[in-house]
């Protein structure tokens, strides 16, 4: 007998969506007396549609959060490192506290270290500079977890082995927007869960003989994609995932509605 197979849903974050002026004014009025800025508005706006849609593992933030990261860094002028790197932690802690008070078991997304594009004019060489940035990232993420954030999703286009070795772990997940055999191999070398679109399922199947692929987060999956994924992994090892770029109210609701198939 055929039955419905349902999948858990997981967010990998969202792009920043600017609502009309009236929505922003109303939001500011509701927060009167509480410290906030446009980034606060954007991260809350990225989260609320996920909660309303019933995403199992929501995630605030996205690539746009790099503006907060950059403004919080010590030792830079523009995007150039000119002194020892450090971080002004309180703005990040405020974001973490605000969001953790809205949603438990919440993850947070922002760009991986190399994606923010810093140039080095202080450290002896580029390796010393990037490892100093890794240290700052560890401090930022640990501090946010101490305030209630469950974990972080680091977005990248081209994952780098040294970066995953330094940062990937149970509470830090790397998501690559470019899916090639090489990028997937680098990811799977350090994490047993991978997020891909359906077009990369063939690559994943080929790599399963070499790597321990425990779970697949299938991005923007349709019914045919889920049936295809079920040919290579059992349902409990598949998750419907998404990264919203537009019309997030509809996007997340649609993802939840389509997170099942008849089999």
Language-model-derived ranges and their functions:
Residues 1-263:
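Domain-level signal for soluble alpha/beta catalytic cores
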